[in-house]
Amino acid sequence: MKFIVKPHPEVFVKSDSVRKRFIRILESNLRSIIQRETKGVEVINRRDHIEVTGLSDEYRDVTLSVLTQTPGIHHVLEVKQSGFKDMHDIFEQCLEMNREVIEGKTFCVRVKRRGNHDFTSIELERYVGGGLNQSVESASVRLKNPEVTVKFEVANDKLNLIIARHKGLGGFPLGTQEDVLSLISGGFDSGVSSYLHIKRGSKVHYLFFNLGGPAHEIGVKQVSHFLWKKYGSSAKVKFISVDFDPVVAEILEKVDDGQMGVILKRMFMRAGGMVAEKFGIEGLVTGEALGQVSSQTLTNLRHIDNVTDSLILRPLINWDKEDIIDLAREIGTEDFAKTMPEYCGVISKKPTVKAVKEKLEKEEAKFDFSVLEQAVYNARVMDIRDIEKESQEQAPEVEMVSELGSDVVVLDIRSAEEEDEKPLELDGVEVTHIPFFKLATKFGDLDQSKEYLLYCERGVMSRLQALLLIENGYKNVKVYRP
């Protein structure tokens, strides 16, 4: 198993010292994750690229998943590496790998070469291409728009025959940009905006203003943990939860209805600024898009921004909702967002779309700011890696089962893609697939005389979903951990 990792082109327009630092950080990030997820896989910095090698293909899929989900990588070449004697030896190796691929098709040969050789890249392309054309009678050369492009690299004394090219995430290596604090609600927008800053190289910490109780917090923890685990697990980041119920109660009691939405957002930014300052974070990230709701007009956004000195970053400011949902689907947060409640939208019955500074200040003069300060002071800060541990501690009443009786039903709560990739088949036991995001609404329709065991790959989602069901009064739920 061998992969050649090509950093994003923007890395190479940096100065020499910055480029070297970025690639060292990318190397460190990859090594951190790969050593945790695999055994015997090496990560080697080759200055202008990174090589990832293993003695066998045992961890091929896991390694490729890490490489294509790590920020800072443009593409990944899956290669077969060997030595060579001369151009004819290279041709013979290319023929062995590509004979069946080019049969009955048009093709061309493209070579990248580094090092000192007695041939040029063009000479090698012509030699190998001519040899393939003569050796495979049904194939024909076409230099423009061929059906097959035979690609390989010659690096000094090594020949890299390209098996496949995999698209990377792009962006900058995680940790090359300054940290940001994402105001996450668990919906489509905040998940996508968090992802975009991870992709751009920032360690994203998560700040959650809890308006919906334990169930809402569990849901937001799930999506935050998912984003960190899939795209940023080389970084140590924080999940911070602030109970905003007292703040909302104060607004509802003392603030004019039309100003409530903007004032709530101003309170979010004030609290976010306090938390960011405490942890030395320069920027707040939100999922706001221009004109999407009443508080997101230019006038209202300006009034919202003015309450904090923190830089407010809005990567989705000009995005259409449809495009946001499409990206959420692509990165894997759509299923979380579908069932995530939006509590902020009910705050005003007749919200203003063009708030006036004097009116806002008049209404905020009625507000007891000690309530906000106390809420921030009582914020709960945790390492995002502890969410998995907490799910076990929060649900001690959730029984873990490893052996199955014939009278139980196993609910596979993984996504459809995960279930298709690794179907759960158990002899003599009924297995039903209900994705986790449908479980809350579908579970009540099941036969409640039966006992249900929830299953997912790592046991994190199944524990959290079991806790939610138990909180909703269901007692016939356990977790299956084979």
UniProtKB/Swiss-Prot annotation:
Pathway: Cofactor biosynthesis; thiamine diphosphate biosynthesis. Keywords: ATP-binding, Cytoplasm, Disulfide bond, Nucleotide-binding, Redox-active center, RNA-binding, Thiamine biosynthesis, Transferase, tRNA-binding. SUPFAM superfamilies: Adenine nucleotide alpha hydrolases-like, Rhodanese/Cell cycle control phosphatase, THUMP domain-like. One of its GO terms (molecular function) is tRNA binding. Residues 404-482 form the Rhodanese domain. The active site is at C456 (cysteine persulfide intermediate). Residues 61-165 form the THUMP domain. Signal peptide: none annotated. InterPro entries: Rhodanese-like_dom (IPR001763), Rhodanese-like_dom_sf (IPR036873), Rossmann-like_a/b/a_fold (IPR014729), ThiI_AANH (IPR020536), ThiI_fer (IPR054173), ThiI_N (IPR049961), THII_Thiazole_biosynth_dom (IPR026340), THUMP_dom (IPR004114). It catalyses: [ThiI sulfur-carrier protein]-S-sulfanyl-L-cysteine + a uridine in tRNA + 2 reduced [2Fe-2S]-[ferredoxin] + ATP + H(+) = [ThiI sulfur-carrier protein]-L-cysteine + a 4-thiouridine in tRNA + 2 oxidized [2Fe-2S]-[ferredoxin] + AMP + diphosphate; [ThiS sulfur-carrier protein]-C-terminal Gly-Gly-AMP + S-sulfanyl-L-cysteinyl-[cysteine desulfurase] + AH2 = [ThiS sulfur-carrier protein]-C-terminal-Gly-aminoethanethioate + L-cysteinyl-[cysteine desulfurase] + A + AMP + 2 H(+). Its EC number is 2.8.1.4. ATP binds at L183, I184, K265, G287, Q296. One of its GO terms (biological process) is thiazole biosynthetic process. Coiled coil: none annotated. Pfam families: ThiI (PF02568), ThiI_fer (PF22025), THUMP (PF02926). It comes from the Bacteria. It is an enzyme of class 2 (transferase). GO terms for cellular component: cytosol. NCBIfam families: ThiI_C_thiazole (TIGR04271), tRNA uracil 4-sulfurtransferase ThiI (TIGR00342). This is tRNA sulfurtransferase. The lineage of its organism: Bacteria, Pseudomonadati, Pseudomonadota, Gammaproteobacteria, Vibrionales.
